[in-house]
């Protein structure tokens, strides 16, 4: 989602050539470059799924999202070096993330859809394995850690073995959970409601907020709202690691310091995250809302 490929003078030319907006100044925040025009702030977000953006456009212009700015051609997607971007006007929303996660959501259709997580994860496993062959023995930090996270990925896929023909309603969900990108149209997709809740639990851990919150109370409060077998599978699924490998691949296998530091931090947190999942699993077992999983050790 970030505008990694639009930096320096390039961004000024990009906006000048595509939009009727003059840049007064710019600054970096939340992994984006912000551009000020009078008292308005704008930023560019990469479009990873153009089809998804078109499909959900009605919700973006009628809901609480950052405003999409049309370009000079009357289109909302602009292209630079074969990558698609949108310009968004920042709107300040005052909200508590936990309130939005817990809030009852309306399904976007009265027709249930097939859950595709398992197939997506299998495809991603094959894709990462193929790409990894190009950098074997190039980066020790990946060579020494990738088998562990492959193991987690296989475990998550295994947990969904009974959900290959599972149907449920779809909701507006988020690719990533964080405060700033919560209202970013490029961060929205259709999925089952378990996606946001499980990713919120991940967010609490990796933002180090879980120590200040009673996770067991969050779980118990939502026992009747979610399928916790799906949530456990998604908690185990190590997208936080493989997303960084995706960035490395997108960056032509050039390892920048940000990616290195983030992977290093994830590896340092492995034991703590296992304990975190174990504690959540214990609460779920005690409340009989989940199947027993032999490979999860209760600490």
Locate the predicted segments by residue.
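ATP-dependent phospho-/nucleotidyl transfer catalytic cores
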Residues: 25, 115-176, 212, 276-299
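ATP/Mg2+ or Mg2+-diphosphate-binding catalytic cores
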Residues: 242-299
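Hydrophobic alpha-helix feature that most strongly marks membrane-spanning transmembrane helices
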Residues: 202, 209, 219-223, 236, ...
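Active-site Asp-x-Gly
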Residues: 181-229
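ATP-binding pocket architecture of kinase catalytic cores
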Residues: 36-113
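Central hydrophobic cores of alpha-helical transmembrane segments
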Residues: 230-236
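Juxta-kinase regulatory segment immediately upstream of eukaryotic protein kinase catalytic domains
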Residues: 1-24
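Membrane-cytosol interface segments
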Residues: 29-31
